């Protein structure tokens, strides 16, 4: 849940950043309405119970409703949707909920019944949600990766400035505790 929360905190800050771009023709106060955060998780029985609790705290998951079968047919995935105004806070590795500022966040959570690996999760995202949401751009972020406060905006800007751009990537920096240094050159690169 710590890694998931770290990623979500970064995503929330990016949405706030875009909402604060009041002189932008695209973004601004209502920017949150143009952004949907899709979370895809493999295998219902495998998801960390504390991560489930964080998702429930955000309002995008309800424990106890998901079933393996409906009318004798196997269920492939469970989809939850919610627009939250709850935020997350990290104190060490402890995750806690906190009231957010005025910026809501639209969440879509897909909990797959079976473990079908990362590529299948990407397929779910593009084929299922992509068709419905019809996004201009998609940003894929693994749990544990914390985007900088304007990283998602910078990726969007690359696509906006160059409409023929098919893909872009950001820089990933190692997160170290204060006062720590990397002495292993293989890890430092």
Curated annotation (Swiss-Prot):
A GO term for molecular function: chitin synthase activity
Top-level EC class: transferase
UniProt cross-references to InterPro entries, sorted A to Z: Chitin_synth, Chitin_synth_fun
One of the GO biological process terms: chitin biosynthetic process
Pfam families associated with the record: Chitin_synth_1
Keyword check for Cell wall biogenesis/degradation: yes
Bilayer topology: Multi-pass membrane protein
GO cellular component: cell septum; plasma membrane
Entry superkingdom: Eukaryota
Keyword terms of this UniProt record: Cell membrane, Cell wall biogenesis/degradation, Glycosyltransferase, Membrane, Transferase, Transmembrane
UniProt keyword Cell wall biogenesis/degradation, yes or no: yes
Bridged cysteine pairs (disulfide): none
Catalytic activity: [(1->4)-N-acetyl-beta-D-glucosaminyl](n) + UDP-N-acetyl-alpha-D-glucosamine = [(1->4)-N-acetyl-beta-D-glucosaminyl](n+1) + UDP + H(+)
Subcellular location: Cell membrane
Enzyme Commission number(s) from the entry: 2.4.1.16
Chief location category: membrane
Function: Polymerizes chitin, a structural polymer of the cell wall and septum, by transferring the sugar moiety of UDP-GlcNAc to the non-reducing end of the growing chitin polymer.
Classification via PANTHER family: CHITIN SYNTHASE, CHITIN SYNTHASE 1
Family the entry assigns: Belongs to the chitin synthase family. Class I subfamily.
Name the UniProt record assigns to this protein: Chitin synthase 1
Organism field: Rhinocladiella atrovirens
């Amino acid at each position: 849940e710590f890694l998931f929360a770290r990623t979500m905190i970064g995503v929330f800050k990016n949405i706030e950043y875009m909402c604060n771009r009041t002189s932008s023709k695209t973004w601004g106060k209502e920017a949150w309405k143009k952004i949907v955060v899709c979370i895809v998780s493999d295998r219902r029985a495998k998801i960390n119970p504390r991560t489930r609790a964080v998702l429930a705290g955000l309002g995008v998951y309800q424990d106890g409703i998901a079933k393996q079968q409906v009318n004798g047919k196997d269920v492939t995935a469970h989809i939850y949707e919610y627009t939250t105004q709850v935020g997350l806070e990290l104190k060490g590795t402890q995750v806690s909920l906190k009231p957010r500022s005025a910026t809501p966040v639209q969440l879509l959570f897909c909990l797959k019944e079976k473990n079908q690996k990362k590529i299948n999760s990407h397929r779910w995202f593009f084929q299922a949600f992509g068709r419905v949401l019809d996004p201009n751009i998609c940003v894929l972020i693994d749990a544990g990766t914390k985007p900088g406060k304007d990283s998602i905006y910078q990726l969007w800007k690359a696509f906006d400035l160059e409409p023929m751009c098919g893909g872009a990537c950001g820089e990933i920096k190692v997160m170290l505790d204060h006062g720590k240094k990397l002495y292993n050159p293989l890890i430092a690169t």
